[in-house]
Swiss-Prot record:
<comment type="similarity">
    <text>Belongs to the DVL/RTFL small polypeptides family.</text>
</comment>
<feature type="region of interest" description="Required for DVL/RTFL small polypeptide activity">
    <location>
        <begin position="51"/>
        <end position="82"/>
    </location>
</feature>
<feature type="compositionally biased region" description="Low complexity">
    <location>
        <begin position="29"/>
        <end position="41"/>
    </location>
</feature>
<feature type="region of interest" description="Disordered">
    <location>
        <begin position="1"/>
        <end position="47"/>
    </location>
</feature>
<dbReference type="GO" id="GO:0008285">
    <property type="term" value="P:negative regulation of cell population proliferation"/>
</dbReference>
<keyword id="KW-0472">Membrane</keyword>
<keyword id="KW-1133">Transmembrane helix</keyword>
<keyword id="KW-0325">Glycoprotein</keyword>
<comment type="function">
    <text>Small polypeptide acting as a regulatory molecule which coordinates cellular responses required for differentiation, growth and development, probably by restricting polar cell proliferation in lateral organs and coordinating socket cell recruitment and differentiation at trichome sites.</text>
</comment>
<feature type="transmembrane region" description="Helical">
    <location>
        <begin position="64"/>
        <end position="80"/>
    </location>
</feature>
<feature type="compositionally biased region" description="Basic and acidic residues">
    <location>
        <begin position="14"/>
        <end position="27"/>
    </location>
</feature>
<dbReference type="InterPro" id="IPR051525">
    <property type="entry name" value="DVL_RTFL_regulatory"/>
</dbReference>
<protein>
    <recommendedName>
        <fullName>Small polypeptide DEVIL 11</fullName>
    </recommendedName>
</protein>
<feature type="glycosylation site" description="N-linked (GlcNAc...) asparagine">
    <location>
        <position position="83"/>
    </location>
</feature>
<dbReference type="GO" id="GO:0005886">
    <property type="term" value="C:plasma membrane"/>
</dbReference>
<keyword id="KW-1003">Cell membrane</keyword>
<dbReference type="Pfam" id="PF08137">
    <property type="entry name" value="DVL"/>
</dbReference>
Length: 87
């Protein structure tokens, strides 16, 4: 019986400590914060991938525009040379 009373005392002390900790820190909010932190780090990775994809898409679009401008300039110079060489 002595062992059961010591278990009860230690159990109640343990529960009291838990209650005090949860009362001080807001036990449920602490769990929420830790889960939101892990989800925000996941979102950070996902946003990082999206940012990389957007950056690549922007660079491809820019290179395509540069290539189009260069092509138009070359065509213009060829036409200009052909027109002036004929005259």
């Amino acid at each position: 019986m002595a062992s059961s009373s010591s278990l009860t005392r230690s159990g109640s002390v343990h529960l009291d400590e838990k209650w005090k900790l949860s009362k001080k820190d807001g036990g449920a909010s602490r769990i929420t914060r830790s889960s939101s932190t892990s989800s925000s780090s996941f979102n950070g990775k996902k946003q990082g991938r999206c940012a990389f994809t957007r950056k690549c898409a922007r660079l491809v679009k820019e290179q395509r525009a540069r290539f189009y401008i260069m092509r138009r300039c070359v065509i213009m110079l060829i036409c200009w040379r052909d027109n002036y060489s004929d005259s």
